[in-house]
Regions:
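Long, low-complexity intrinsically disordered regions
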Residues: 1-220
Length: 220
């Protein structure tokens, strides 16, 4: 197939249209516009950078003039139309796309990342039991850890934090709400504040590849 040459202004217009930055209200207004925007973009990266406002709020506000922070909270924690997981970074993802991330979740069952090399299975079981017994929690709710020295600047002295993170990447728990960067973790079941999904859907390789091919050009 012969490459198609386009001018820089044309390429710019194509990109702006794909990103829905060339129309005033591409996703409508009100709380429902937030999951619609995330659905079109495929995901919205969650960023700790905070000069004027956090990056994910900027991304939504530039496409939804009436956007408010509580709209994202509503989508994640009340209506459960989006969930958090890792794309190239931590991101908000449409809940209907969760099945396409199951392969990544299962990979953490087969391969132990160097980030979690020191996490023991019994530590993961302990935090899971705690969530099942007491409901959703944040790392601040865990006050009986034996503190350890940090192995890098962003680490926690609580071993339970790394265990919670591994459970998250395995798809055993989800982030049911956020307060800034403080995450509330819960089971996937709706009774404990999760997404409402009782178990992970089955993974299928071919539909996942097809989805990647469809989703990537739409917003990039």
């Amino acid at each position: 197939m012969e490459p198609c040459a386009i001018t820089q202004p044309a390429a710019r217009r194509i990109w702006l249209h794909a990103q829905k930055l060339d129309t005033p209200l591409p996703f409508g207004s009100g709380p429902g516009a937030t999951p619609e925007a995330i659905r079109h973009l495929g995901y919205v990266q969650i960023d700790t950078i905070h000069v004027i406002e956090r990056c994910h709020h900027h991304i939504l506000f530039t496409r939804i003039p009436e956007y408010r922070r509580e709209h994202l909270h509503r989508a994640q924690s009340i209506e459960k139309t989006v969930f958090e997981y890792w794309t190239h970074a931590l991101a908000y993802i449409p809940i209907e796309d969760m099945r396409y991330y199951v392969r990544a979740m299962r990979r953490y069952w087969r391969l132990r990342s160097v980030w979690f090399a020191n996490v023991k299975d019994n530590e993961v079981r302990k935090v899971l039991t705690r969530i099942r017994s007491n409901g959703a929690l944040t790392i601040r709710d865990i006050d009986d850890d034996v503190l350890v020295e940090k192995d890098h600047a962003w680490a926690s002295r609580k071993p339970s934090k790394r265990a919670l993170q591994l459970a998250f990447y395995k798809g055993l728990v989800t982030v049911s709400q956020r307060a800034g960067m403080l995450k509330t973790m819960s089971s996937w079941g709706g009774t404990s504040g999760g997404s409402g999904c009782r178990r992970l859907p089955r993974q299928h390789r071919r539909p996942t590849i097809s989805w990647i091919g469809h989703c990537a050009p739409r917003a990039s």
